[in-house]
């Protein structure tokens, strides 16, 4: 998984590495293009389906499952999946796997303990998502949850000394404005609301979830950059801590009720779908994101907002008014602008600036044209668009 770099984007070894695909035969290039669009489809479906499935499972009539048990089950399945992947990497040799895990988890215990912090935050974040989606329409949650881009960017600047372009700062302001409009529409919108839903609680939960996502994602990225452990090993360690911490949270919040009614109380096929999506969704994205760049991830998030909104209209009777459409449009535009590579951002900035006559250079006749920069994609280094938590959520 060395190809997965910071923020889940494709790692680049140098200027030539990005453009290497252009030098491959047409068949290889076409296959890579197909994989990119498959990645886009997978990201769109995963982003939208998780939110919609949680909303659907939490609003079904009848006995409601305990969200804390779903979080624990997702961590267990995620950890087992990573264990199987590591087992496959060791070519099915149990002895080699045991020795590897003993060395990586127990002998290097300080590295393992570093994962306790992001694991605690991710466990909290997953529980907050259930609270938020239970109290907000799926489309409203999907739009508001894009604040994680803002929090991730701010924590990246503070913790990793990362610099953002002026276009990215402008897109973050646009993002905040769009979310504020959507929340204003939610607060002032008419129409009956279910009695068991509290938009204020939902907003507080989604903001706390975005803050935790931003911090934990950047913290996890810092750990990955400072160590040689594989992504699957780190996810296994996170799964171990996540399971333990999730059980503690379950006992503290709903221990008596779970003991009385059972761990799997209220579980239906829809609930199992949520658990599987939460467990395997992030791991699936970790694989397919190898073939997708930041622009595709921006499109995926934007399209998932549209898909969530359309599905919410059909499934939950969600009403889209002009204020929501304006806010969602600003968020979609901000997501796309933020995900643009630096080269494209500079092109947009230069295109918007006035050009003067002396700056226009005419090539004298008879001389070969200067080398084109388009064959050198060194400027296509991108800032992380999604937090590293895309690998573990």
UniProtKB/Swiss-Prot annotation:
GO molecular function terms here? antiporter activity; UDP-galactose transmembrane transporter activity
Keywords, A to Z?
A: Antiport, Golgi apparatus, Membrane, Sugar transport, Transmembrane, Transmembrane helix, Transport
The places in or outside the cell where this protein is found are:
Golgi apparatus membrane
Cross-referenced InterPro entries: Nuc_sug_transpt (IPR007271)
User: For this protein, what reaction is catalysed?
Assistant: UMP(out) + UDP-alpha-D-galactose(in) = UMP(in) + UDP-alpha-D-galactose(out); UDP-N-acetyl-alpha-D-galactosamine(in) + UMP(out) = UDP-N-acetyl-alpha-D-galactosamine(out) + UMP(in); UMP(out) + UDP-alpha-D-glucose(in) = UMP(in) + UDP-alpha-D-glucose(out); UMP(out) + UDP-N-acetyl-alpha-D-glucosamine(in) = UMP(in) + UDP-N-acetyl-alpha-D-glucosamine(out)
Q: Which GO terms describe its cellular component?
A: Golgi membrane
Task: Family membership, please give it.
Answer: Belongs to the nucleotide-sugar transporter family. SLC35A subfamily.
Name of protein: UDP-galactose translocator
- Could you tell me which species this protein originates from? Bos taurus
Tell me the gene name. SLC35A2
